[in-house]
């Protein structure tokens, strides 16, 4: 077993060797290096064919038509294109958007920008288990609502929203529905031929593909229109200009092909590993699981260890690569906005750790992690005056601290 152990697969994943192999075939003079928009010679045709194959591999995994896949530089750009593209195109119909407080920053910050441009956004608070209340969603819908954006799997707590029910509700009201599926694709089945989802953001680097490439699914029937945010040569049916990065797209395609083959077995394996981890640490005093144990992704476990500072716990777990909150916001010392939205106190939100497992995680690594967590929590609580007071039966919340 190699140390340190990587348990931060929701931040990014290593590229699968099979994916790297395919990508390398698209870089050098002997490979498929042409510009796919070069229609006048074989180098361009080969590149175009490689992209067509990848587009089909991605569409196959999610039950889409390959013509509905628009390549972007990643899920953040896909989120921006979906929200700004719809808002700009349909603004004469209405200027109201609905999302939730626990969305990824790429959604929340895009919504903030649209608010500055004159749109109105309703931010729904989730229930304490992280799920959105459909009645609240319906109550928030208005005649001028043009878009709902609610993610499939939350990147911090792994809670799974009922995108099928949300899609039905949106379709019945004639409202466009966007889903950020960055954390769910390849872990949970997605069939867009059955789901009433109009736009769906995808990433490659969360599923053993390369960074810097993603896609936006844009439904053709009923047809969804977007205003382009990137202008130029009119690539991707005018929705996203820019020369297509053949090696990255081929890598994404291969990653999605592997997911389609291996997803069923891998989901079962990850679920077992996640439960093994939880069963190994749930007997620690004052430990709480964040989110819902039933409606959850197979690979994410977010836990709060009361009376232990999350940052110091991460330092103590020097042989485990874990995070507090998501990588996109882990540089800030603010408590996680996702956990605060669930109603956690600052203290509990600060004491949370996200463990995310993946393709190369083993039982041996999980058992080692359990051992390390037990000893680190013991050591840190021995140093904690708050823990001592808690053990003496003092109600910490009732203490009035004096500020110096």
From Swiss-Prot:
Binding residues annotated for [2Fe-2S] cluster, in chain numbering: 328
Gene Ontology molecular function terms on file: 2 iron, 2 sulfur cluster binding; cysteine desulfurase activity; metal ion binding; pyridoxal phosphate binding
UniProt binding sites for pyridoxal 5'-phosphate: 75-76, 155, 183, 203-205, 243
Main location: cytoplasm
EC code(s) of this entry: 2.8.1.7
InterPro entries in the cross-refs: Aminotrans_V_dom (IPR000192), Aminotrans_V_PyrdxlP_BS (IPR020578), Cys_deSase_IscS (IPR010240), Cysteine_dSase (IPR016454), PyrdxlP-dep_Trfase (IPR015424), PyrdxlP-dep_Trfase_major (IPR015421), PyrdxlP-dep_Trfase_small (IPR015422)
Pathway this chain belongs to: Cofactor biosynthesis; iron-sulfur cluster biosynthesis
Subunit and interaction comment: Homodimer. Forms a heterotetramer with IscU, interacts with other sulfur acceptors.
UniProt family annotation: Belongs to the class-V pyridoxal-phosphate-dependent aminotransferase family. NifS/IscS subfamily.
Function according to Swiss-Prot or TrEMBL: Master enzyme that delivers sulfur to a number of partners involved in Fe-S cluster assembly, tRNA modification or cofactor biosynthesis. Catalyzes the removal of elemental sulfur atoms from cysteine to produce alanine. Functions as a sulfur delivery protein for Fe-S cluster synthesis onto IscU, an Fe-S scaffold assembly protein, as well as other S acceptor proteins.
Protein name: Cysteine desulfurase IscS
Source organism of the structure: Proteus mirabilis (strain HI4320)
């Amino acid at each position: 077993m190699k140390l340190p152990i990587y348990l931060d697969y929701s931040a990014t994943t290593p590229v699968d060797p099979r994916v790297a192999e395919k990508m390398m075939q698209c870089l050098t003079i002997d490979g498929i290096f042409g510009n796919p928009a070069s229609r006048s010679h074989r180098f361009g045709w080969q590149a175009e064919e490689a992209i067509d194959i990848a587009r089909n591999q991605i569409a196959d995994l999610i039950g889409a038509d390959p013509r509905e896949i628009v390549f972007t530089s990643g899920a953040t750009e896909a989120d921006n294109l979906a929200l700004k593209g719809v808002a700009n195109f349909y603004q004469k119909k209405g200027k109201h958007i609905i999302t939730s407080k626990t969305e990824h920053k790429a959604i929340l910050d895009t919504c903030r920008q649209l608010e500055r441009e004159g749109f109105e956004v309703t931010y729904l608070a989730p229930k304490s288990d992280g799920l959105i209340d459909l009645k609240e969603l319906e109550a928030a819908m208005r005649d001028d609502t043009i878009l709902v954006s609610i993610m499939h799997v939350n990147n911090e707590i792994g809670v799974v929203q009922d995108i099928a029910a949300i899609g039905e509700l949106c379709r019945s009201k004639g409202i466009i529905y966007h889903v950020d599926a960055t954390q769910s694709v390849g872990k949970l089945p997605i069939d867009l031929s059955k789901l009433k989802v109009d736009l769906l953001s995808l990433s490659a680097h969360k599923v053993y593909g390369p960074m810097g490439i993603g896609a936006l699914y844009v439904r053709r029937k009923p047809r969804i229109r977007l205003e382009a945010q990137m202008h130029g040569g009119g690539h991707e049916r005018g929705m996203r200009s820019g020369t297509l990065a053949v090696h990255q797209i081929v890598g994404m395609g291969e990653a999605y092909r592997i997911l389609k083959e291996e997803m069923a077995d891998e989901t079962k394996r990850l679920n077992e590993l996640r439960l093994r981890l939880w069963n190994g640490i749930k007997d620690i005093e004052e430990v709480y699981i964040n989110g819902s144990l039933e409606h959850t992704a197979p690979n994410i476990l977010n836990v709060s260890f009361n009376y232990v500072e999350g940052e110091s716990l991460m330092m103590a777990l020097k042989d485990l690569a874990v995070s507090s909150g998501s990588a996109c916001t882990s540089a800030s010392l603010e408590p996680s906005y996702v956990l605060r939205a669930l109603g956690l106190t600052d203290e509990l939100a600060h004491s949370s750790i996200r463990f995310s497992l993946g393709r190369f995680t083993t039982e041996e690594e999980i058992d080692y992690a359990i051992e390390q967590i037990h000893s680190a929590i013991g050591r840190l609580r021995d140093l904690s005056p708050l823990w001592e007071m808690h053990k003496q039966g003092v109600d910490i919340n009732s203490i009035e601290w004096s500020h110096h």
